Amino acid sequence: MKPNIHPEYRTVVFHDTSVDEYFKIGSTIKTDREIELDGVTYPYVTIDVSSKSHPFYTGKLRTVASEGNVARFTQRFGRFVSTKKGA
């Protein structure tokens, strides 16, 4: 491999702010922020969603009631369609 073309691979702390969890993961992400954990200073990155907070991984899925095409049509355009027969 060519020297000096690969990014620096290092341990980085990712902070999931929605559940206040910290993850130490190897990464090449660049950041100017740092945090000290366990007496060691690491690069620090905040994230909004991780496997600890995403509904798919936590099992707290939101269920969306599925409607048929006719029900959706009636909901959207029902006010324009006359309900009187033989008019």
From Swiss-Prot:
GO terms for biological process: cellular response to zinc ion starvation; cytoplasmic translation; translation. It holds the Pfam family Ribosomal_L31. Induction: Maximally induced 30 minutes under zinc-limiting conditions, still induced in stationary phase; repressed by the zinc uptake regulation protein Zur. Probably part of the rpmE2-rpmJ2 operon. It comes from the Bacteria. Gene3D superfamilies: Ribosomal protein L31. One of its GO terms (cellular component) is cytosolic large ribosomal subunit. This is Large ribosomal subunit protein bL31B. It comes from Escherichia coli (strain K12).
